[in-house]
Design a protein with these regions (language model features):
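Alpha/beta enzyme core
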Residues: 1-171
Length: 171
């Protein structure tokens, strides 16, 4: 596992060189001590629990979290740990709606949902999913508001036809 000094150096570098306004950290109570130290240095931290994109394969792939009582309790413990560590907000990804709703009412930092139902304090949706730009389709909780991927493919196809048919225009 990464040492705290390396964690701090990486976070500072993201802030200074990358121009980040905050650092997102995926995980719960296991990282709370390091998050608390990071916050104490003045670095704002956004927590992230539930589905963790960086470790999705190890967690059994894309699925809902919190459907069994032990897992719901674990998510609650993680959220409280992140709140106590000083996270300014917490992302709840792919969490059972009932669990996310309860959590949003129990913690002070805003709970920002992604695939966790409508009752979180805020919502995130990946722009590529919203615009229909993904090649592999979108997660089940996503409503694509456009289908730009098909439009782009169609436009590129027409362009290729024009090039091959020598129909491109000169000035």
């Amino acid at each position: 596992s990464m040492s705290f000094d390396r964690f701090l150096d990486s976070a500072k570098r993201l802030m200074q060189e990358g121009g980040a306004d905050a650092i997102k950290v995926e995980g719960g109570r296991d990282l709370a001590d390091d998050i608390e130290k990071l916050v104490a240095t003045g670095i704002p931290v956004l927590g992230h629990i539930g589905l963790l994109p960086q470790t999705v394969k190890a967690l059994g792939g894309y699925r809902k979290f919190g459907s069994v009582p032990e897992e719901a309790e674990s998510l609650y413990t993680d959220a409280i740990s992140l709140e106590e560590a000083g996270c300014f907000a917490i992302i709840a990804e792919m969490m059972e709606e009932k669990v996310a709703t309860e959590l949003a009412g129990q913690i002070i930092p805003p709970l920002i949902g992604i695939g966790s139902g409508p009752n979180c304090d805020g919502q995130i949706l990946v722009t590529q999913d919203l615009l229909g730009l993904t090649a592999k389709g979108v997660p089940s909780f996503v409503t694509p508001y456009a289908n730009l991927g098909q439009d782009i493919s169609r436009a590129l196809g027409k362009y290729v036809q024009d090039v091959r048919g020598k129909k491109t225009k000169a000035r």
